[in-house]
Amino acid sequence: MAQFVRNLVEKTPALVNAAVTYSKPRLATFWYYAKVELVPPTPAEIPRAIQGLKKIVNSAQTGSFKQLTVKEAVLNGLVATEVLMWFYVGEIIGKRGIIGYDV
């Protein structure tokens, strides 16, 4: 047991250095995209979002969504899935657990 602990202590700095070296470029890439993608909308973008929602409601009322190409339908489905998953992640964070609320 003592030899195992000694080997672990000897290898720890090398493992930490390898982990830091491996993760630095990936962390930089993550921060780059996080700063761009996770910013709240500006006041100038809100009217465009409202127009987009009105367009979706209008297409549902008139049935024009049936004229979408397969590519557009798949992209719309992916966006809807992303929105639902972010909602679900927020619920998990709010509940502090995957299943149920603490009562």
Swiss-Prot record:
Compartment annotation: Mitochondrion; Mitochondrion inner membrane
Organism (species): Pongo abelii (Sumatran orangutan)
Protein name: ATP synthase F(0) complex subunit g, mitochondrial
GO terms, molecular function: proton transmembrane transporter activity
GO CC, alphabetical: mitochondrial inner membrane; proton-transporting ATP synthase complex
Post-translational modification N6-acetyllysine, affected residues: 11, 24, 35, 54
Record-level GO BP terms: proton motive force-driven ATP synthesis
N-acetylalanine: modified positions: 2
Role this protein plays: Subunit g, of the mitochondrial membrane ATP synthase complex (F(1)F(0) ATP synthase or Complex V) that produces ATP from ADP in the presence of a proton gradient across the membrane which is generated by electron transport complexes of the respiratory chain. ATP synthase complex consist of a soluble F(1) head domain - the catalytic core - and a membrane F(1) domain - the membrane proton channel. These two domains are linked by a central stalk rotating inside the F(1) region and a stationary peripheral stalk.
Pfam families listed in its UniProt record: ATP-synt_G (PF04718)
Quaternary structure annotation from Swiss-Prot or TrEMBL: Component of the ATP synthase complex composed at least of ATP5F1A/subunit alpha, ATP5F1B/subunit beta, ATP5MC1/subunit c (homooctomer), MT-ATP6/subunit a, MT-ATP8/subunit 8, ATP5ME/subunit e, ATP5MF/subunit f, ATP5MG/subunit g, ATP5MK/subunit k, ATP5MJ/subunit j, ATP5F1C/subunit gamma, ATP5F1D/subunit delta, ATP5F1E/subunit epsilon, ATP5PF/subunit F6, ATP5PB/subunit b, ATP5PD/subunit d, ATP5PO/subunit OSCP.
Family: Belongs to the ATPase g subunit family.
Keywords: Acetylation, ATP synthesis, CF(0), Hydrogen ion transport, Ion transport, Membrane, Mitochondrion, Mitochondrion inner membrane, Transport
